[in-house]
Amino acid sequence: MFYMTVQEFDVVVVGSGAAGMVAALVAAHRGLSTVVVEKAPHYGGSTARSGGGVWIPNNEVLKRRGVRDTPEAARTYLHGIVGEIVEPERIDAYLDRGPEMLSFVLKHTPLKMCWVPGYSDYYPEAPGGRPGGRSIEPKPFNARKLGADMAGLEPAYGKVPLNVVVMQQDYVRLNQLKRHPRGVLRSMKVGARTMWAKATGKNLVGMGRALIGPLRIGLQRAGVPVELNTAFTDLFVENGVVSGVYVRDSHEAESAEPQLIRARRGVILACGGFEHNEQMRIKYQRAPITTEWTVGASANTGDGILAAEKLGAALDLMDDAWWGPTVPLVGKPWFALSERNSPGSIIVNMSGKRFMNESMPYVEACHHMYGGEHGQGPGPGENIPAWLVFDQRYRDRYIFAGLQPGQRIPSRWLDSGVIVQADTLAELAGKAGLPADELTATVQRFNAFARSGVDEDYHRGESAYDRYYGDPSNKPNPNLGEVGHPPYYGAKMVPGDLGTKGGIRTDVNGRALRDDGSIIDGLYAAGNVSAPVMGHTYPGPGGTIGPAMTFGYLAALHIADQAGKR
């Protein structure tokens, strides 16, 4: 907890992920005194734990790489997949102002971004979709440049073997290490990068941490303090205007006397969703649900949403999340990406039947796990838990839950029952609680599809997105491979998430709204504390961070404009 001599700023930003840091950076560069308060002992939030991708069509990074796109195509695509659940003005504000935001950030921080070639939009065949992708990611960053603030950077979610630093575009190639020369070449490149960094005394970080680190340096240069272990407890209202926040030391009891920090111009909530609030998840989201399956930052307990709701803020899309099929490993759930796309695997429900294209975008995959429209409906989810079924050949060829190809499944995973292993499909079915006859029939039917290269039931491998994490050396379909080389494995799959989606309704400037559409003066929101501009869908890699940064930017600009700071 900090005890400041100055208890008043122009702008108070709650949360230190991408949304909060960009908002603070803009406010400071517009001449507004700004502070960031962060509940956790580290800064960066869920952004730092993520892949760090940013989905903003027609930005300067893409243009420099010669990526052929148009604003019209992006508009057609995003409006088409989001539908009418989100105000079209908000979608347009994101598309129109996102590139401007990114240029500002690149100018005022040491952040370096690059295109992720081939990382397809999640619905590339939709009108305006791009099979070649619109996602960019941060280049590896030397965290030593942070100085004393290096220690405060949020740790990475998962440890990479041998402590190598990887980018998103590395991961897809490393998964092909045993299957394609490109995998070998990429592993050599990653190894050389790591050795060079060690030889030159650098502490390279990648993915989300390589996004947050440069943003923190931008705040250092702008003189913006980031106060850690400072828990937001409530909003301060004066004369009908949100004019500050109450905070306490995160180490103190919740009953401790809070400290008031006044905000002369506005408060920007950027403190994440409610993925770690069990009561809120049970209240708003379909069963089964738990805080144990999320990979979001542990400090995200809905504090901002609850405080805004007390002031009459409207909430929207609270039933949804940035879902993804997840292996609920004890203590650290594994958000499954390539595991579902690699050939030689299927996902079945407790009836032993397939129920979706296993390789589809992860939010939609979990909607299918729950069943109904966008995962909503009466009663508990229809296909939870599910089981990812694969064989030894799959295990020998591909990365699985952070294990290298051929690496043995840890005994603690098997002992927990999250992973089961057997010499026959019938035995595997018994261990997983599945009907043996149905599982055997499902695998036999799927194997016929694998031989023909056509998934007649769910069209797996037909989309460019499916194929991105597939195996190009596997013919005739990079996503379909027979399951028939014992021993067999089953991995329990549950609807995990990167964070919750729902939150405070906002306008094009990030201002918090009431149910009647009126504005809560002085209060702004960006990131997962706010209802998403993406609605129930997910357009492509970085479709969470891109809007978080953009609406943090727009919120700070609006405050500055209202204050006459240009």
UniProtKB/Swiss-Prot annotation:
Name the InterPro entries on file.
FAD-dep_OxRdtase_2_FAD-bd, FAD-oxidoreductase_2, FAD/NAD-bd_sf, Succ_DH/fumarate_Rdtase_cat_sf
Coiled-coil boundaries: none
Gene3D superfamilies named among the record's database cross-references? FAD/NAD(P)-binding domain (3.50.50.60), Succinate dehydrogenase/fumarate reductase flavoprotein, catalytic domain (3.90.700.10)
The catalytic activity, as recorded, is: a 3-oxosteroid + A = a 3-oxo-Delta(1)-steroid + AH2; a 3-oxo-Delta(4)-steroid + A = a 3-oxo-Delta(1,4)-steroid + AH2
- Show which residues constitute the signal peptide: none
The EC number on file is 1.3.99.4
**Which cofactors are required for activity?**
FAD
The keyword Metal-binding appears for this protein: no
Q: What is a biological process (GO) this protein takes part in?
A: lipid catabolic process
- A single GO molecular function term of this UniProt record: steroid dehydrogenase activity, acting on the CH-CH group of donors
Question: Has keyword Lipid metabolism?
Answer: yes
Binding annotation for FAD: 10-39
Sorted UniProt keywords: FAD, Flavoprotein, Lipid degradation, Lipid metabolism, Oxidoreductase, Steroid metabolism
Top enzyme class: oxidoreductase
**What is the similarity comment for this entry?**
Belongs to the FAD-dependent oxidoreductase 2 family. 3-oxosteroid dehydrogenase subfamily.
Query: What's its job?
Result: Involved in the degradation of cholesterol. Is also involved in the formation of 3-keto-1,4-diene-steroid from 3-keto-4-ene-steroid.
What the entry lists under NCBIfam families is as follows:
PRK07843.1
Name of this chain's protein: 3-oxosteroid 1-dehydrogenase
> Can you name the source organism?
Mycobacterium tuberculosis (strain CDC 1551 / Oshkosh)
